[in-house]
Each structure stands twice: as C-alpha cells, then as structure tokens.
Amino acid sequence: MGIFDGKVAIITGGGKAKSIGYGIAVAYAKEGANLVLTGRNEQKLLDAKEELERLYGIKVLPLAVDVTPSDESEDRVKEAVQKVIAEFGRIDVLINNAQASASGIPLSMQTKDHFDLGIYSGLYATFYYMRECYPYLKETQGSVINFASGAGLFGNVGQCSYAAAKEGIRGLSRVAATEWGKDNINVNVVCPLAMTAQLENFKLSYPEAYEKNLRGVPMGRFGDPELDIGRVCVQLGSPDFKYMSGETLTLEGGMGQRP
C-alpha cells in the first residue's frame, strides 16, 4: 500500500527527462498516486506516461499546456484542470514545478519579453493552477507544493525575471496558506538544487564554473531529482506533514542556509 493509493497529483513540468519534475513523478508513482503531467513538450509527456504506467501500474494523464506569455494561457489552464476532473474526479496534490526564463541576462539588459517569460511561465502559471484547483483541493483537503529558488532568496546574478517570479510564488504561497488553512489545505514552497540534464550540459560546457558551484554545496554534491527532491515532496503532500503550511524548504545540501 502506498501513501497515495487512489489519489491524484498534478505535476507541472513533469515530462520524461532527467529533471526535477520527472523525479517527483517517479516518487509519487512509487506511492501509488495517479498522475497528471503537464508541460509544453507532448512527446516527453507521452514518454513519461508510457514508462510510469509500465513500471508502477498507475494511470497517467499527459496534458500539453503552454503557459508562456499569451492571451490564451489562463483558458489553457482552466481547460487542463477540467480535463483532470473529467478523467479522475478529484485532485489531492498540486505541484507547481514548471518554469521557463531568460537566464544569464543582466537586469539592465532585460527586455519586457524576457521578463514576461519568467513571470508568465512561473508566477502566473502557479496562480492559475492554484485558483482553478482550489475547489477540488478543498473537497479532498489536499496539499499544494510550489517551487521557488535560491536565485530569488539570494539574488543570483543574471536571474532577475526568474528571481522575481520565484519570490512572487513564495508570497502567493504564504497568502494561500493563510486563506486556505480553514479548508485544511496546506501550502508549502521548495527551493531545490538537483542534478538535471540542464546542469549536466552546463558541466560539459563550463567545467570550471560547474566545479566552483559544486564547491559551494556543503554536502559536496547536487541532489537527486527523485530521492532528494521527489521524496521530500511526497512527505509534504502526506498526512504526516499536514500541520506544516506557509513554509519554504531549501533542499540545497546545506547551501541555502538562512537565519
């Protein structure tokens, strides 16, 4: 018996890849959750569905949803959530992991398009999914897990739109934790650091910069998307952590220490 047998978790950015979203999907699948995976790359979503259903005997609903800047973004999320309800009839956990951004561009050189990409794909997407899922999370007394970043906590160079989106998500999450507490919905934030395909590419392209970043992690390694990030998300969505809400957890191997 798994913690989430018969329950449904939505994971944005959950397509098949060496990514945090897919690591979370595997962790939830191992606990019996049926999954809704959203993202922009339909093939990666279909690949994830095939593998997760084959390995874990769960049901996966892949939904190609693009929430980058567009007048249709809000309606796309509404449609996606209605498809979830039509398929499963419930939502128990919402995990807002997806985010695009124009990284590495100094604030003084950011265009409105650069900034909009970060805000729409991160902050607006999280807001839309939270608002549309709320009635169903209320029914199940569910959980929301939103993703922020050390880029926002510590003001990383070249990350202005990304950091702004992530800190907006933290503020949104605290308000939701306050407003939705009466419904027994808990809302928490995770700031992850994990070895993803994107980070592997960075290692190949900039080995010296990669090693410098690695030396900044007290534990001496980048996290595993499933074991170090996904398993924590499983606990945050479980009954054992129900009383914790409005908090930010830094899963960065000791690098994200704050007073």
Swiss-Prot record:
Assigned EC number: 1.1.1.176
pH dependence, record text: Optimum pH is 8.5-9.5 for the oxidation of cholate.
InterPro entries named among the record's database cross-references: NAD(P)-bd_dom_sf
EC category name: oxidoreductase
Activity relative to temperature: Optimum temperature is 55 degrees Celsius for the oxidation of cholate. The thermostability of the enzyme is greatly increased in the presence of NADP.
Molecular function as annotated in GO: cholate 12-alpha dehydrogenase (NADP+) activity
PROSITE patterns listed in its UniProt record: ADH_SHORT
Biological process terms in GO annotation: bile acid catabolic process; lipid catabolic process
Signal peptide coordinates: none
Catalytic-site annotation from UniProt: 162
Lineage: superkingdom: Bacteria
Catalytic reaction equation(s): cholate + NADP(+) = 3alpha,7alpha-dihydroxy-12-oxo-5beta-cholanate + NADPH + H(+); deoxycholate + NADP(+) = 12-dehydrodeoxycholate + NADPH + H(+)
UniProt keyword list: Bile acid catabolism, Lipid degradation, Lipid metabolism, NADP, Oxidoreductase, Steroid metabolism
Subunit structure: Homotetramer.
Misc note: Enzyme reaction proceeds through an ordered bi-bi mechanism, where NADP(+) binds first to the free enzyme before cholate, and 12-oxochenodeoxycholate leaves first followed by NADPH.
Record family assignment: Belongs to the short-chain dehydrogenases/reductases (SDR) family.
Function: Catalyzes the oxidation of the 12alpha-hydroxy group of bile acids, like cholate and deoxycholate. Is also able to catalyze the reverse reaction in vitro. Is likely involved in an epimerization pathway of bile acids that converts hydroxy groups from alpha to beta positions via stable oxo-intermediates, which occurs in the human gut.
UniProt protein name: 12alpha-hydroxysteroid dehydrogenase
Protein's organism: Clostridium sp. (strain ATCC 29733 / VPI C48-50)
